[in-house]
Every structure is written in C-alpha cells, then in structure tokens.
Amino acid sequence: MTEMNATEATEKKSLNFIEQAVENDLKEGKNGGKVQTRFPPEPNGYLHIGHAKAICLDFGIAARYGGVCNLRFDDTNPTKEDMEYVEAIKEDIQWLGFQWGNEYYASDYFQQLWDFAVNLIKEGKAYIDEQNSEQIAAQKGTPTQPGTESPYRNRPVEESLELFNKMNSGEIEEGKMVLRAKIDMASPNMHFRDPIIYRVVKTPHHRTGETWKAYPMYDFAHGQSDYFEGVTHSLCTLEFVPHRPLYDLFVDWVKEGKDLDDNRPHQYEFNKLNLNYTLMSKRNLLILVKEHLVNGWDDPRMPTLCGFRRRGYSPESIRKFVDKIGYTTYDALNDFALLESAVREDLNSRATRVSAVINPVKLIITNYPEGQVEEMEAINNPEDPSAGTHTIEFSRELWIERDDFMEDAPKKYFRMTPGQEVRLKSGYIVKCTGCKKDDNGNMVEVYCEYDPDSKTGMPGSNRKIKGTIHWVSCAHCLPAEVRLYDRLWKVENPRDEMAAIREAKNCDALEAMKEMINPDSLNILTNCYVEKYLADAKPLDYLQFQRIGYFNVDKDSTPEHLVFNRTVSLKDTWSKINK
C-alpha cells in the first residue's frame, strides 16, 4: 500500500465490529500479534464497485494495524476462468490505490488439498458418491427436516480412494461422481449435510493445464488456503455466515487438532454493497457484454471498476464513498446519489476547468474589431491556486450554448436575451442586441455588443451582472464528440425487478434485461466544440466543462477526433444537461 493510502486508512472512521475484533485479538496477543488479510477474487470476470468495498476493507485493515494483505485468486473452476481476468483484476486493485503483499492462487495448493482429501477418505470423513446432482439435492432435506443418507455413504475406504484417483486420471466423466465430506445429514445447518468437496472438471486450467481433472469446491479450498497462507482475519460478505461453521470444521480437520485456539484464520462477515439502479452479479454482467447490450466490460455505464475508470471516476472518490457507507452486519440498498456526491466532491478539488459548448449557436460581437484575437487568462481550478492558469483565445465570433439564449425570456432569466447584459466568463460584459433565424424558425446567430472597459480584471468589470455564460472562439476551438451517460437501468432495484419479470413472463434473464434497460442511458453529441487547450488531453485527465459537468477523455479519442465522457453532471440548478 502506498504511503498516501496507508495514511488515509488510518484516518478513516471506525470500522465498527471488524476493527474491534482485530483490536481485541491484538490485545490478547493472538496470532503472535500478527494481522494478515487477503482479497480472494475468482478470475471469472471483471471487478465491480461491490468488490471495491471488500478491497478497501481487506487492505485497509491490514494497513491500519501494520499487517499485510495478500492477493489470492480463487481459481478452482477452470470452465469460467481466464488470465484476461487475472490481469484486469490486478490492474483494478492497483488503480484503486492498493498493493498486495504476495500473489497467490488456490491452484498453488491443489496438491495439498488433494492430500488433505485423501487423508479424510482414509479417516472415514469423506466418500465417493455416484449419484447425480438432482439425487443429491433431493436427499438434502429442508431446514426443518433431516436429509437422507446417500447409499454410498458407508462404502469401503479403499473403494472411495480408488474412485477418487480415477476422478483425477480422466477415467470418470463430469457429473458421474463427486467426493463428499461425511459430516451430519441431520444437522440444522444445511452446509453440514455431507457437502460436495470435489467434482470432475475436464476443462484445462489456465495455470495448471491438464494436470488436474478433479477440482476442490469453494468451501473446501477457501478456509484451507487461508490456513496455508497464515491469514488471521478472513473477511467476507454476509451470505457466508452459514458457511462459517463448515469453514471452522475444515480448518480444525486440516490442523489435526493442533493449536486450535491460536494461529488459525477466523472468518468475519460484513454487508455487501448494494446500489439502486445497479446490477452487480458477474453472471448478469457477462450477459450484458456477450449480448452487446453494452460495449464491453469497461463500458462507462457498467458498474465495473474499469467502467468507472473509463467514465472518469477517480479512485479517491470510490474510496471516499466506501468509507462513507461503512460496514455493518445487515444488508441495505444504498442510493447511487451518494456515489455521485462523492465523485463530485473529489473532482471539484482536482478537475481542470475548461470551456466546452455541446449544443452550439454562433454569437457575433458586432462592435468587436474583425480579425482581432485576444488571449484571456482562465483559472484551472479555483479550489487549488497551485493548479495555475491557461489561456483561451477570444474573438469576434464565438460559440455559446443554445440554451443560453432566449428571445422572449421570463423575468428571472439572467442569461442572454435582447436588451440584457451578461458576462462572458474570463472575457467581457456584453449586451444582446438581437438574433437571426432560418426559414424554419431555427436560431442560427445571436448578436451582441461588448463593453471594451469590462474585460475581466479591468475596473469596468466590477459592476454587478447576474448572468455569466461560457464560450469558445469559433476560429480557435476543436470539434469534439461528447458522450452523455446516464443510468443503465430504468428501474430502481433491477435485481428484484428482473426476478419478478422472469417469473411473470417465464422468460430468461436476457429478455428481462431488455425490458428494464434505459434507452436513454447513452446520448452521443457530435456537433460540440472545446477550447484548444484540450488538444493534448489524455484519458484519466479529470476535467470540468464549466457549467455543464465533469468529463474525461475517452480511450476512443484521437487527435483528429476528440471524444469526451460525462462522468457526472453538476448538481448546480443551472446545469445545462438534464440529469
């Protein structure tokens, strides 16, 4: 973790029960005073905003208490995993501002896990079951009714050992048999009812190739991997609460009764990040990508970290948002407006102010000398004096926002209308004198006169003018494409709504998504103009288009065709773009 992030972590507000648990362990001298966490993503998709909450906790706890957070890829399902996701996950973690101590993979422990499973078979704690998944599920019982024992539950140890080896040799087809832990089919905890701990998967693994055909299940690999690595605090989300007894049991078994009260990982659960108007299941996000409902994993409408990055969110804003919502032991639906507020607050302090006109109409200053060009000084960021200034050219013909002119304006309209003065930001005070329309009544030109003594910085500029508008010089600007992004979904809770649609219409997830998707989630404007200062702007440069919103350069942008993404609109009521 960088020095900045370590400082930020220590300045965060209390992490409540998790922080208290860690502090209690340290006071009691557990784990030799060590704090070690891990972030264990499965490399089967791109990280989303929900993962950011887990990342901030895993790395933040380690930083706060002088420990280490390792990165471990839970690569136990080769059918869905790929090195593309491994590299993308690492990039996202580092972009978010964190650096792991060691990089591990569950596949690093395949041999140890195999040996552990063999030992369980020898001890009579595991057996090969040749029933199919439907039969096994039917025998599970219910939370109030005990399950039914498998007819293979008491098969000879030697037979289970032989079949287990055949599972891994390639002799057994997928779905024909599994290895189950022998625990308690009458346990009130359904996860104790002889859980499957190994299954056959013949898809080559992205790291181990075809070495293995039998793969451990998540519940069997996770706790043991924590133990092998020396994790002290295993942090996960609330759905794993009922898994914790099984986690503890497998750790007890792998430790073979040694040091049960110390030097072992303990699992703690916290609430997931749920956002309204957001769908975060990787399974559903994959459908969006594969069916081209979005333009890839990094589409700025996606809740993926790479999507937020491309849209122009700063890592600091995401960390601040996560810190603001905190960690609890109950689930809640958070308002997306909180995330937007966090990015506005952060970008306000770091974004460079520039001029851009996204719905242009020409303004002609009729008494300004033809051919004259002035360089006006524009402040880069009024919140940060050290950010300096840049120059913007001013001339007789300017582009202004079409919405900044109204021929018959109401009384409280303070922008450009005949007979009224407005201030051209960083320039002069002008008075509107009229306009010109085409044969269809469309506005094509607006006319005004300027006060030569009212240039910004001159004494004449000090008189009170209620309206200020932005502009760019027609002869000194650059054409640009501007992409205005909005919510991808038109329903507040797309997860629940999708379930309701599927049940009501007996349709698949894709059809339900098509019904929920917001047709106005992307509006592309091609007739826009930006000041020349942006000719060298690069992706991840944070910008504020004055009076419009926060933007950044898209990766599709080229010097010949500039493309800007709206990160978030301004909250000001005079913003020219509807939210």
Spell out what each predicted region is:
Residues 85-111, 116-119, 124-127:
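A glycine-rich helix N-cap at a beta->alpha junction
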Residues 1-13, 579:
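Basic/polar N-terminal segments that are highly enriched at the extreme N-terminus
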Residues 29, 58, 89, 120, ...:
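Residue-level signal for inorganic ion chemistry
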Residues 71, 75-77, 83, 105, ...:
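Active-site cores that bind ATP or allylic diphosphates and position pyrophosphate for catalysis
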Residues 240, 244, 248-250, 316-319, ...:
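Core subunits and conserved enzymes of cellular information-processing
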Residues 13-90, 206-237:
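N-terminal catalytic cores of NTP/NDP-binding nucleotidyl/phosphoryl-transfer enzymes
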Residues 262-342:
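Long, charged, mostly alpha-helical binding arms that flank functional sites
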Residues 40-43, 72-80, 102-111, 134, ...:
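Conserved short loop/turn motifs at secondary-structure junctions
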